[in-house]
Amino acid sequence: MDHFHTRTHNLKGTISPHVQQNIKYTTKVMQDCNDLVQKQFKIGTNHEISLYIVYMDGLVDTEMLQESVIRPLLQDSFPQERTAINQYVIESADWKWIDTMEDAMTAVLSGNTVLFLDGEARAILFSSKSFPTRGVQNADQEVAIVGPKDSFTESLRTNTALIRRRIRDTRLKVIQKQIGTRSKTDYALMYIDDLVQKDILNKIQKQLDKICVDGIFDNGMLEQYLEKDSKTPFPLYQLTQRPDKVASSIMEGRIAVVLDNSPMVLLLPVTLNVFFQASDDYYNRWEITTFVRILLYMAAIISIGLPGFYVAIAGFHPEVLPTPFLLALISAREGVPFPVIVEVLLMELSFELLREAGIRLPGQLGGTMGVVGGLIVGQAAVDAHLVSTIVVIVVALTAIATFSIPNELFTSAFRLMKFFLIILCAFWGLYGFFLGFLAIFIHLFYLENYGIPYAHPMVEERGRLSTAFQDFMVRYPLKRMKYRPEFTKEGARVRQKEDEDEK
């Protein structure tokens, strides 16, 4: 028997017109579910109509349920006609008829209330969700000095509302579905209908529909199921906790996947360039943003290549150094028993462990652990003549460069590539250094994301100068950014009208 595709209970049956049958069925299916609340009532002038209400404790707004559903039904004036029930529950914010037990049980487990009516072969679903969740808080992972401070929560509807609040356009679509055969996690696709490329949208929808797994609990999991090329360390999707970033991305023709229970929203498609765009890039003047972006691209090269470059120079090609630098290197390494490669790996791995320890420790203690631990370990290693002072400086500069890159998933790929270059340089010196960088660049240039080159706009598939260069290393003034990037469908790339005064 295929235990994955076989349901524990057969939920495909239709709803019985006899309330007692529905009670027996629900009790059997939901056996040992002590958080299930079941209530039976007799209503009508002569109390001849049986009702059965089912919901999960802790997932519903009981006050709303009592005031809008139960109290009207218990009125003595309730008519004998069963079809008149909708007139007495119209105060409920949202309700509808459902026909199968599968829909009924799924609704109950999703935080809704289901009412079974004797003599009616269908049930009424009341929207009564009231999940325990935290409120909207500051974005702690993508801090911005200028601009909005709010961030997403674990509530799907709260997150879609934060986006809808910023884009008050009827063409902003929200397509809601479920994923996971057991978790039945709600998710929503959000896009602007006249900006999105329909072929990309269709591909994403087909990918999501094909995912057959028992549970999806975070967009980080969903990202891994969506990616086609799992042989690259570079992220092919973007995760963010900032509603303003999602709103601006949607207005560029991109698609957002909002997953219930996840405080991060998935953006796709992506290119290499979007990972260097900080949250407040568009709230600052273009000169400042351009300067910062150039620094970030330099930081990316340093974070990947500096340790390997030091291994290549100190271990294979010290003759390329000017004499004062060479003497300083020899003096710094005096008394160190290990070769250069062991020095660098020892310090890099130590800093990686300190970084992980800082992440795992709670609150401010984690940041303190990272800074103080790094200083203590580095100084102790130098005093013990296990490593040279130059190696500590190299590793520290590499760490600073890595932390300056805005996207955490992207920096994780850089951390792996750093060790790749260190190993190559340990065997072949500068030849390994340049070959390694060449291999990384070739890999990036060959990657694609839904038909869009990953290295766009450095790689342009249409053989013409891309409008994306206006938002690349140099960020043009906002008045000159008249076109949307290549994510947008053809014919909808104009973002703003020409200023007659500037002609």
Task: State each model region's role.
Residues R122, P132, Q141, P148, ...:
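Glycine-rich, flexible loop/turn motifs
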Residues A300-V320:
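Hydrophobic alpha-helical segments embedded in or immediately adjacent to the lipid bilayer
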Residues F309-A312, P322-F325, I330-A332, V336-K503:
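Generic detector of multi-pass transmembrane helix bundles and their immediately adjacent loops
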